[in-house]
């Protein structure tokens, strides 16, 4: 890279607004920015290398005589719900194209009539009568994709839904206690992890309105007017005036860029080169264990600390146990970027309805990692100080520093646009080792209803579990923390070419082990 940091792209709102296409006046389009530029890189996006998956496991509460549930019945109702969702959130039907610039062009065209809209909805929902789980279907999707000419494939759609259950056919009535995995496959370009959950929750709530209704008529929607519901261009939605950004913004941006490059060349786990199938493994704590961990964090570290602070610290401690670095000095540090929901920096009234990507980042910096290790130069006695306050304190200090900036979203938009250009020129930025990457997504209950319920209040299906995961193409372990019904879930997303399942799950268990210490 050299000693001089690259110049950040200028944030120009006029370059990223919705406008009519010169090729087809029916099409609205805008230039991607920030994380959209990263996950929208043409080669990666066509290959689905950042695709998102959300998996909800539904269980029938009882056999209803008034509403005999089957996969076909659920498919028909979901199709109608999707029509309403497309009208309210057209992001779910956007497309992408590319030109000679790195950031993609995001496009939207209204359906010409109800029939075209219904055809789109029907093509978005699929039935799988199989003993496979949602995870199995995801692996099948990705396995088939690897057998194709990936560079010339059509990119993934914004959303495709799979209804998966072990029944004989789609008409078969679901018995009491039967499970249905609802797998949502999304192109990351059109959503981030928060808006993907927002959309899924909205979809399930719309399904609640329709599921006990005998009406099969299409909802009356005035197609053509829904384009006004597209999320506002993010630069126009910022609370701050980007024209007023000055030296402080530039200095913080340079600090962030420097940290990104430090991450590419810093401490990490050894990986094997190559690109294979994406994989995900899960570790779920019970609700009792999760509450005990949270209480332990508050008691040991202080009421202002969260389970997210602990989890990020545990990722670093687990890394030290796995790699057992020799000859650490007091100057050795751990640096890693962490994605952050950017909606807090949007204007009031826009944050709760922004479905396009709205993501920035914070830089986690833990000083003197030697101090986290006992018996550093004695292999037999090597072990991290897993009960020490320091890593959690450093994590919180990093969080507070970056999240307190009023311009943090603007900073992330500029830096991530720059990073997309860097990754286009350097598709493999890591050399031999890569630092594990931590993401905290919070409580899924904020977005997803606990059950599928009729308008009369009858619970037809409970949502027993909900988990989010994504495809991983870069050679780092992505550790995600989320929860469902008070039970915390740690997941690891990785690429099979870079790590074996044994290596990935070993690391995940190390993270969970150190977090559980705080429950004791």
Curated annotation (Swiss-Prot):
- Functional summary from the UniProt entry: Trichothecene O-acetyltransferase; part of the gene cluster that mediates the production of the antimicrobial trichothecene harzianum A (HA) that plays a role in Botrytis cinerea antagonistic activity and plant defense priming. The biosynthesis of harzianum A begins with the cyclization of farnesyl diphosphate to trichodiene and is catalyzed by the trichodiene synthase TRI5. Trichodiene undergoes a series of oxygenations catalyzed by the cytochrome P450 monooxygenase TRI4.
Per its UniProt record, what InterPro entries does this chain match? CAT-like_dom_sf (IPR023213), Tri3/Sat12/Sat16/Mac1 (IPR009992)
What's the family? Belongs to the trichothecene O-acetyltransferase family.
**Gene that produces this protein:** TRI3
Q: In which pathway does it act?
A: Sesquiterpene biosynthesis; trichothecene biosynthesis
Stretch list, region Disordered? 1-23
Q: Does the keyword Cell inner membrane apply?
A: no
Biological process terms from the Gene Ontology for this record are: mycotoxin biosynthetic process
List all Basic and acidic residues biased stretches. Answer: 12-23
User: Does the entry feature the keyword Transferase, yes or no?
Assistant: yes
Please report the name of this protein according to its UniProt entry: Trichothecene O-acetyltransferase TRI3
**Any idea which UniProt keywords this protein has?**
Transferase
Source superkingdom: Eukaryota
Signals that turn on the gene: Expression is positively regulated by the cluster-specific transcription factor TRI6.
User: EC number(s) of the enzyme?
Assistant: 2.3.2.-
Q: MF terms per GO, please?
A: acetyltransferase activity
């Amino acid at each position: 890279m050299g000693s001089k940091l690259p110049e950040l792209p200028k944030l120009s709102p006029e370059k990223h607004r919705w406008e009519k296409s010169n090729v087809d006046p029916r099409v609205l389009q805008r230039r991607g920015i920030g994380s959209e530029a990263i996950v929208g890189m043409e080669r990666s996006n066509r290959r689905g290398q950042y695709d998102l998956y959300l998996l909800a496991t539904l269980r029938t509460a009882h056999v209803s005589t008034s509403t005999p549930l089957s996969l076909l019945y659920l498919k028909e109702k979901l199709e109608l719900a999707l029509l309403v969702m497309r009208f309210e959130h057209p992001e779910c039907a956007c497309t992408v194209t590319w030109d000679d610039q790195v950031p993609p062009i995001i496009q939207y065209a209204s359906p010409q009539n109800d029939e075209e809209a219904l055809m789109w909805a029907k093509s978005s929902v699929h039935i799988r009568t199989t003993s496979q789980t949602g995870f199995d279907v995801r692996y099948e999707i990705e396995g088939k994709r690897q057998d194709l000419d990936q560079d010339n494939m059509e990119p993934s759609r914004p959303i495709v839904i799979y209804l998966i259950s072990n029944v004989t056919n789609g008409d078969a009535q679901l018995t009491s206690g039967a499970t249905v995995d609802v797998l949502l496959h999304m192109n990351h370009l059109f959503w981030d992890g928060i808006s993907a959950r927002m959309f899924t929750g909205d979809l399930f709530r719309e399904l609640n309105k329709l599921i006990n209704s005998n009406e099969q008529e299409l909802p009356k929607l005035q197609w053509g007017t829904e384009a006004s519901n597209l999320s506002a261009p993010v630069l126009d939605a910022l609370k701050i005036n980007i024209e007023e950004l000055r030296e402080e913004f530039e200095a913080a941006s340079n600090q962030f860029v420097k940290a990104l490059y430090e991450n590419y060349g810093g401490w990490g786990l050894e990986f094997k080169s190559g690109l294979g199938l994406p994989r995900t493994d899960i570790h779920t704590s019970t609700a009792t264990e999760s509450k005990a961990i949270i209480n332990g964090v508050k008691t040991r570290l202080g009421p202002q600390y969260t389970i997210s602070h602990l989890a990020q610290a545990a990722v670093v401690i687990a890394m030290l146990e796995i790699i057992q670095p020799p000859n650490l000095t007091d100057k050795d540090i751990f640096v890693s970027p962490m994605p952050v929901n950017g909606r807090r920096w949007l204007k009031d009234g826009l944050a709760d309805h922004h479905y396009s990507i709205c993501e920035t980042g914070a830089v986690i910096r833990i000083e003197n990692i030697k101090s986290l290790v006992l018996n550093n130069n004695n292999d037999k006695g090597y072990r991290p100080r897993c009960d020490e306050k320091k890593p959690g304190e450093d994590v919180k200090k990093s969080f507070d520093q970056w999240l307190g900036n009023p311009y943090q979203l603007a900073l992330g938009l500029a830096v991530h646009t720059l990073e997309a250009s860097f990754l286009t020129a350097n598709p493999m930025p890591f050399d031999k080792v890569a630092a594990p990457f931590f993401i905290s997504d919070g409580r899924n209950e904020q977005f997803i209803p606990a059950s599928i319920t009729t308008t009369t209040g009858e619970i037809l299906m409970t949502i027993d579990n909900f988990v989010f995961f994504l495809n991983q193409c870069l050679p780092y372990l992505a550790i995600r923390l989320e929860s469902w019904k008070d039970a915390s879930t740690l997941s690891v997303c990785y690429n099979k070419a870079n790590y074996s399942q044994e290596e990935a799950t070993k690391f995940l268990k190390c993270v969970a082990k150190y977090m559980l210490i705080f429950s004791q």
